[in-house]
Amino acid sequence: MPAYFQRPENALKRANEFLEVGKKQPALDVLYDVIKSKKHRTWQKIHEPIMLKYLELCVDLRKSHLAKEGLYQYKNICQQVNIKSLEDVVRAYLKLAEERTEAAKESSQQMVLDIEDLDNIQTPESVLLSAVSGEDTQDRTDRLLLTPWVKFLWESYRQCLDLLRNNSKVERLYHDIAQQAFKFCLLYTRKAEFRKLCDNLRMHLSQIQRHHNQSTAINLNNPESQSMHLETRLVQLDSAISMELWQEAFKAVEDIHGLFALSKKPPKPQLMANYYNKVSTVFWKSGNTLFHASTLHRLYHLSREMRKNLTQEEMQRMSTRVLLATLSIPITPERTDIARLLDMDGIILEKQRRLATLLGLQAPPTRVGLINDMVRFNMLQYVVPEVKELYNWLEMDFHPLKLCTRVTKVLDWVKEQAEKEPELQQYVPQLQSNTILRLLQQVAQLYQTIEFSRLASLVPFVDAFLLERAIVDAARHCDLQVRIDHSSRTLSFGSDLNYSTREDAPFGPFLQNMPSEQIRNQLTAMSCVLSKAVGAIKPAHVLQEKEEQHQIAITAYQKNSRKEHQRILARRQTIEERKERLENLNIQREKEEMEQKEAELQKVRKAEEERLRQEAKEREKERILQEHEQIKKKTVRERLEQIKKTELGAKAFKDIDIENLEELDPDFIMAKQVEQLEKEKKELQERLKNQEKKIDYFERAKRLEEIPLLKKAYEEQRINDMELWELQEEERISTLLLEREKAVEHKNRMSRMVEDKELFVSKLKASRQSLYEAKLKQFQERLAEEKAARLEERKRERKEERRVNYYRDKEEEEERLREEQLKQEREEQEKVENEKREAEQRDYQERLKKLEEQERKKRQRELEIEERERKREEERRGGDDTFRKDSSRWGEREESGWRRGADPDERKQVPPERDWRRGGPDSKPVINEDASNREEDENAALRKDEEQVSSRAFEEKVSLPDADEEKGGSWRDEDRGPKRGLEEDRGPRRGIDDAGPRRGFEEDRGPRRGIEDDRAPRRGFDDDRGPRRGFDDDRGPRRGFDEDRGPRRGIDDDRGPRRGFDEDRTPRRGFDDDRGPRRGFDDDRGPRRGFDEDRGPRRGFEDDRGPRRGFEDDRGPRRGFEDDRGPRRGFEDDRGPRRGFEDDRGPRRGFDEDRGPRRGFEDDRGPRRGFDEDRTPRRGFDDDRGPRRGLDEDRGSWRGGDDVPRRGADDDRGPRRGADDDRGPRRGEDRDQTPWKPMAASRPGGWREREKAREDSWGPPRDSQAPEEREWSRQGEDSEKDSERDRRPVREESAWRRGGDNSETPRKPSPGDSDRKDDSDKKRPPKTDEANPWRRGEDKDSREEERGTPRRAPAADREKSAWRTEKKEEKDTPRRIKPETDEDGWTTVRR
């Protein structure tokens, strides 16, 4: 394909231009490039004329291969678009080829018969001739005029058939071309081409059956397709018969039968009649008279059954032919000696079965069977009278002397009907042979010896030589017992008495047996005669005795017949079973052998396929490489030829031979070309320089010479111009004068018409003025009407707009009033509910105080008992000083390892019964795999708390002030040294203590340490360390934060009992069945279950569930100040809300608000402890103190449990100790003895009723907020909490905060700490002096409930305020929060 792109129209035009000048090859190349172009793969109307012109050129130039390639390309182009165009193009192509061939045939006298195969024109004779004459084979063939065109036409037919095969869209065209090809072979007697054509059609048919899944495949089940194939095969059969190619005709018959087998419907009777007629001809030509007669029988029966208009003459003609064909069958089948010796009977039978299959017969026919069928179907009655008796003479009558004479008359009549019945003439020789054989058989039964001349006189239609040959053949094949005596010229019959006839000996008219047959059956005949004689001469009593014996035998048989029959059946059954078993074994063995053989064959086949595949790949690679090499050589050759055509290339490559392509490459050619270009360029530049110099000198010399001549010419031109100007000026003046005179004359002549003109104009204006005024008046009227209509429409629209606005305002006012009414109803309902809750809470407090009083008394008794036991134990030990010093419970506690984190040596002295506190040396946190089991245990413990409260639980809740002061073990005693966290003789309080990790919601140790815990008690139950500090302890506070806070929850605390002692209210976190256990920061379990079950799970630092609630979170609001769902961490928890790891507020605070300010923006203390897992967590609120339980993994434990992880952000154990934790107060918390007041969460009915009431009374649901509102709400929460922490006063740092001399040191802040600190500093709002309204303090008159504190959004985010904050800031909002403070210091939120 050329490098340039050419449109199809331009290519056709270009080709026509080439044809006009007689250049057919360039025109063909142009069209070929367009057809092969990949840019023209879509059929266009211009493609058809291009293809016709292309094929015309191919025919003219006899380029059959180019025509084939073009047709294939055109098929791909138009197959899916316009298949009719392909049919037209192919028909036109074949028509052109046929016309050219016919023209060559008319103009040539040379015949094509001397060349047997057009594909193999080169014969041995032509090779010798070319060697002698030195003439090329193709030249000799081209010199012949007709042969090349016949070959071209044959190739055209074959190429078109290959092109159209197995394509249902051009199936009709395919069969038309196939029939044309058969006619071509018949016309030019091309036998070799006919065989090839038959093979091709047979191969195409097999491909149709094999590739039936293609989109354009032919469906052989289609009746139209079957009829077309049968039609083509019948034409093939006719052509084969006409050309006497009987082998090809037989193959065509097999193909037709195969098509019949494919068809589900029977073929048409006309088609079957034609088929039987052709097949009968093939059988007769092949010498198979038996199947020829059988075919005629089938044709006769088909015609009688299917043809309704069958005439009597046709019946006679068909019956006569069937009779003659049947009687023409040889009496005995001919079988040669070699066939008898080789035992070819099986092969012959197989061949006969195949032939019978072609006729639809179940078994091969026989001569006797056909004759019987002919008689049975009464076919003889339709035979012409002249031939009717032939059957009786040959098959029934025994009359040897007149047999040949009678048959001769019939044969003479048949010969006379040669013109009317030509097909009957072929049976005459066979009938004569059968007549001679019948004559010999009958003569052999009559005569023992007969003269040859006498026998010859009985057979008048043959000569002596043929008669002798017939006698010899009869003796060989027909078991005729005859001997020829040439000396006496006689024939002897039956002379050999030892001769035995064959079983298949022919039957015919019979008179008597031959002597040999009589000798062979003599004993049989004698036996029959003797048995008859014995029967005649036997006496009567012998016959009677024989009859009696016969009856006895019959009776015995009848008696034992059934038993014998059963025995025979059983034996037969046994034999059958044994045979079946043997057969099954044989079948199984054969099957196994077959499978083994098949596996081996499969393996060999796979190996062979793999080898062939590899060879094919290698061949394909070699072919591709060769193609690439050829393309490369072709490119180089074309490039060299193009370059050599130029003047530059001719010079550069004059010494290079194009044939030596192996030594050349494109780079070499390009280098030579560039070198020659550079050389010529240099020569051209030098030549141009020389020429430039020469021209420069020449021009300078010319200008020097022409200067004086130019001056002279200038002067002459100036003078001439002056004279010309003067002459023209005079002519102009004279012309102007003449024009002036003519203008004056015209003015005078036209001035007489002025008055008439003015009169005409005035009349015209007067007539038009009235018309103008009328139109103007009409316009003014229409303008007024349109203006009035528009004003009316505008008035109506304004009126409608005012009405709509009025109704809309009215509806809005009604809606506002309805909302206000609803708000008032909700407020009243909430007020009633709050009063009811307060009453229930008071009842609950009273019951709880009674329970605590009982527990305190039990505890005191148990303490006294334990004190007496301890004293007796110390006295029994011998009064050692060390033990006496520690004899008191408090002194011993000072040195116990669980309090001061003693050295390993000291920890070894701890009694083994206290190992449960440390968790033992090998104690490790245990993760609970089944949270449901733990919750069931917890609930069981809570349900039995009143009946099974142990003395140990009571001892931990109560402290005895007097005993503490006497023993010097008071926790508030200032002489004991620094508070918790700074003591040298005690470990830090429970952090990662000796008792193992604190109880968490991920542990499988059962419920948290509660009232009926059956394990070793936690601090204070039966502990020798003394009870924990209670709220009524008069000792110094062990929580070293400040002194002005109320005490932690104790037994006699008037704030109401801790959670977990009463069954009426919802238990605190960790004991509730309905809620999940408290969550840690990085807990990846299910969602945290608190008061509200529809919230998302609580998030932690390393939680992989996505980010926690931040500014960009679109989930519902977190529990905060205004959340009426109750605080998350315990119903009565007065602490601030739990903080998340993305919280931008200040560091988290402890449990009271009266202490120093929280860590704020300007705090210069150490890094905060808590939220970040890679920083040391806070102990309460300061960094310098001993570490509290949790939050950091790289610090030491307070109780020596160095290998036990502490609780914190990454701790999967239980939650931290909350404000309502029943494990005793935490060190560092508020110790103020102010009575404890329950929050609004302590309501009767449980948290579910409160949640339901909240949802009924509150505003829109949490999840119904827009993402922007929820984001603002959370930002408001965080910023408000930060501001509240920053407003707290700074407290003095105590030794407890600095952590004493503990070996644990805060770890270095990680790079992430500074980043998070910077982020929090940037986001933190400015500090204010406003106190936290939801904390209790002594210096305040009132306390607000956790939900009652309004939030304020950060300054940067005030424009994003959500619906919660808007209802506080906007007075018009119906849902506005109204905090009210009662006399007890509690704040109630009214909405």
UniProtKB/Swiss-Prot annotation:
* Listed GO MF terms: RNA binding; translation initiation factor activity
Q: Which keywords are on file for this protein?
A: Cytoplasm, Initiation factor, Protein biosynthesis, Repeat, RNA-binding
Give the primary localization class.
cytoplasm
In terms of SMART domains, this protein maps to: PINT
Residue ranges that the Swiss-Prot or TrEMBL entry lists as coiled coil:
none
Q: Which InterPro entries match?
A: EIF3A (IPR027512), eIF3a_PCI_TPR-like (IPR054711), PCI_dom (IPR000717)
Sequence ranges of the sequence repeats: 973-982, 983-992, 993-1001, 1002-1011, 1012-1021, 1022-1031, 1032-1041, 1042-1051, 1052-1061, 1062-1071, 1072-1081, 1082-1091, 1092-1101, 1102-1111, 1112-1120, 1122-1131, 1132-1141, 1142-1151, 1152-1161, 1162-1171, 1172-1181, 1182-1191, 1192-1201, 1202-1209, 1210-1219, 1220-1229
Q: Name one GO biological process term.
A: formation of cytoplasmic translation initiation complex
Gene3D superfamilies documented for this protein = 1.25.40.860, UVR domain
Gene Ontology cellular-component annotations: eukaryotic 43S preinitiation complex; eukaryotic 48S preinitiation complex; eukaryotic translation initiation factor 3 complex
The PCI domain extends over: 315-498
Renumbered to this chain, region (Disordered) spans 809-1391
Known function = RNA-binding component of the eukaryotic translation initiation factor 3 (eIF-3) complex, which is involved in protein synthesis of a specialized repertoire of mRNAs and, together with other initiation factors, stimulates binding of mRNA and methionyl-tRNAi to the 40S ribosome. The eIF-3 complex specifically targets and initiates translation of a subset of mRNAs involved in cell proliferation.
Give the record's subunit note.
Component of the eukaryotic translation initiation factor 3 (eIF-3) complex, which is composed of 13 subunits: eif3a, eif3b, eif3c, eif3d, eif3e, eif3f, eif3g, eif3h, eif3i, eif3j, eif3k, eif3l and eif3m.
Q: What is this protein called?
A: Eukaryotic translation initiation factor 3 subunit A
User: Whose protein is this, by species?
Assistant: Xenopus tropicalis (Western clawed frog)
